[in-house]
Design a protein with these regions (language model features):
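Anionic-ligand binding patches
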Residues: 2-5, 12-183
Length: 183
């Protein structure tokens, strides 16, 4: 396998995935490219579209979202836009008075081998609840309002929990298993 490169403009995502790769003594390159945010119905569509723009080296991209049950899965694939527009405060405003606070983070990683070939998709998910207020300064995005199932603190309060159970880590683990078996 040639050098594997993560294509993202998001330094926080890169840092999170690189940490996981470091745990497995694997080198991970970073191609810092700002990809246009495709408005699609699924994370998989966004990832496949992003990968269609790259050839020549082993690359992967990742897209993620938070899907809130009481809001019909919103913001879902529009998570970045919604976060940039209204932030956590806007989500919490929408959730005022809502008892069902169930939510899930989903991440989809798409891998494209050097020289083309079929794109392989790997999905990770973590279930939990939306907190009543933002808690913690750690992480990024929706981390301060997401409490993973089985824990009492948000990802923003305890980044060590996120590093153990995050949706992104679960997708990256599947990518790593694939790479070990196939390349």
């Amino acid at each position: 396998m040639s050098k594997l490169s993560f294509i993202t403009s998001n330094q926080d995502k890169y840092r999170e995935v690189k940490s996981f790769f470091n745990e497995h003594s694997l080198e991970l390159g970073w191609t810092r490219v700002s990809l246009p945010e495709l408005q699609a119905d699924t994370l998989e569509e966004v990832v496949e579209h992003s990968l269609s723009q790259f050839n020549g080296e082993d690359v992967f991209v990742e897209d993620a979202g938070v899907f809130i049950d009481a809001l019909g899965g919103f913001p879902g694939v529009y998570s970045r836009y919604v976060y940039d527009t209204v932030g956590n405060a806007g989500i919490l405003k929408l959730m005022e008075g809502v008892e069902n606070r169930r939510a899930r983070f989903e991440a989809v990683i798409g891998f494209k081998p050097a020289g083309g070939g079929d794109v392989k998709l790997f999905k990770g998910e973590v279930r939990g609840n939306v907190s009543l207020s933002p808690k913690g300064e750690g992480g990024f995005g929706y981390d301060p309002i997401f409490i993973p199932e089985g824990f009492i603190k948000t990802f923003g309060e305890d980044e060590s929990v996120k590093s153990m159970v995050s949706h992104r880590k679960r997708a990256a683990e599947k990518l790593l298993q694939y790479l070990k078996r196939n390349l």
